[in-house]
């Protein structure tokens, strides 16, 4: 009888070990943000972002270990208003190592919401794996009475561990929604439903911890992207100028004097430019500073050769990219070429 009991014990132990071994390996990379924020009381709106470390975040949501083998590392501890090129390059290189050399099955990145869409799109163009990479954040600090971070983190891990997440590019997961890095944008300053895709809708959603997909990105990303940051230590300098009635051209002048490599315009309407800015844009393009037209309007495309004769002035139209994402693509495009026609092709394809 003792032998039978011992055999059963060993058998059950082996099953347990096998089940554990079959869990997808998910690495959580922490960068700070509101999801790691701390306030003095549960009802205060004032807080300090990025106070909690990665292990505190993991310990706060033990359920994330139910369906995945979880580990984590701290990349930086900042509010995402301070996100920069160095962190982007660090993230892209580290993610490529983890997925392609260290055998991880997926990545979750905790990140502030202010610039999350920019980081997501940068990684969408520079990660060299079709395994899931999911950015997650929160609109309320961890100490808030009704913090949204814990459930968002749980959901993000569920997405990263889901076999159907493969090949969908980098994703953003908040408020039960799964969104494409290319098309997601922040639409509300404080609401938990802030992240939306106003042009195409969600990639999927979560219900009772289950992931359901209803869409797939069509534009090139990740393993189909030509952009490789492996040997890069810095990125081209690209700025954004804003158009409005009676707009000042001083920002344009400043970027040109500082010898920026490219300039993106947040134009009015269909990417149109105030006259003073337009005149300097023509001059900048003639000086070898690539100029891209985008729009401050939240939906719709900036159309090539509409009211502006882009072919005549060698301007690039951003298509469906908003100004901040157009800046990301232009930075990477300039690592490949300064040919405006080729850069326009990138904007058409990505």
Q: For each of these PLM feature ranges, what is it?
A:
Residues 136-207:
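Internal gly/pro-rich beta-alpha loop/helix module
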Residues 21-97, 279:
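ATP/NTP phosphate-donor binding region
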Residues 42-51, 115, 121-134, 149-155, ...:
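A glycine- and small-aliphatic-rich helix-loop capping segment at beta-alpha/alpha-beta transitions
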